[in-house]
Design a protein with these regions (language model features):
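Amphipathic alpha-helical packing segments from all-alpha helical-bundle domains
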Residues: 126-150, 154-169, 185-188, 192
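Short, hydrophobic secondary-structure boundary micro-motifs
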Residues: 42, 116-119, 182-183
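Generic hydrophobic, amphipathic alpha-helix propensity
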Residues: 18-29, 46, 71-75, 79, ...
């Protein structure tokens, strides 16, 4: 009982407090790594933003690079979860395409810091070298599963890989301002790509 009391403070257990500190650090990391113009991410800056001492940083992360990778993986997990939930809650291929693109826009564009972490940070942050390549298969698989009209497995795989690359470039352009189309037009264009990708080669021809 005494041990339990020592490990509990203000009604919160030690592990819960540790998890809360880790979440606060990750949230600070998203804001810093996803800042417009790419703010410098240092241990000191992260701790200052999270209002925690460096002792608590090293409680959860071995070093700065491990932290940066954890931030990226956290945003990647959020993106996967949002896409899976959107697709699962929709019926027709058209509905699934709209739901998937809308969910990604909501997560990555409405909260641009997350979008910059997932799509832009790997291009500039050495600690993320290869991280985008590691995450890509999960998104390829998700797209792959939606391309049901393509019966040939090789065709489905190649189409899914190409489509993820195209959509990634579109979202990067939308985030950095290269693409200035209205949101509705942007979503409609991405949905059209998804729908066109699901058609067998030459399937629309007579």
């Amino acid at each position: 009982l005494l041990d339990a009391q020592r490990r509990t403070w203000a009604g919160t257990g030690l592990e819960e407090r540790r998890a809360a500190r880790r979440e606060a650090l990750l949230a600070a990391g998203i804001e810093l790594l996803g800042a417009e113009g790419g703010a410098a991410v240092s241990v000191r800056a992260v701790c200052r933003s999270a209002a925690l001492t460096e002792r608590y940083f090293y409680e959860s992360f071995a070093d700065r690079d491990e932290f940066v990778r954890a931030v990226y993986e956290d945003v990647g997990r959020q993106a996967r979860d949002a896409l899976v939930a959107a697709v699962a809650s929709s019926g027709s291929p058209q509905d699934r395409a709209v739901a998937a693109v809308s969910a990604f826009v909501e997560l990555m564009v409405d909260d641009p810091a997350r979008g910059r972490v997932l799509l832009l940070a790997p291009l500039a942050e050495p600690a993320l070298g290869g991280q985008g390549l590691e995450l890509a298969p999960a998104f390829v698989l998700l797209v792959h599963q939606q391309l049901s009209p393509l019966s040939d497995p090789d065709e489905r795989q190649m189409t899914a890989v190409g489509l993820v690359g195209a959509l990634t470039s579109l979202f990067i352009g939308y985030l950095d301002g290269t693409i200035t189309a209205p949101r509705e037009q942007f979503v409609a264009h991405c949905v059209a790509l998804l729908q066109a990708a699901g058609q067998p080669p030459g399937g629309s021809r007579g």
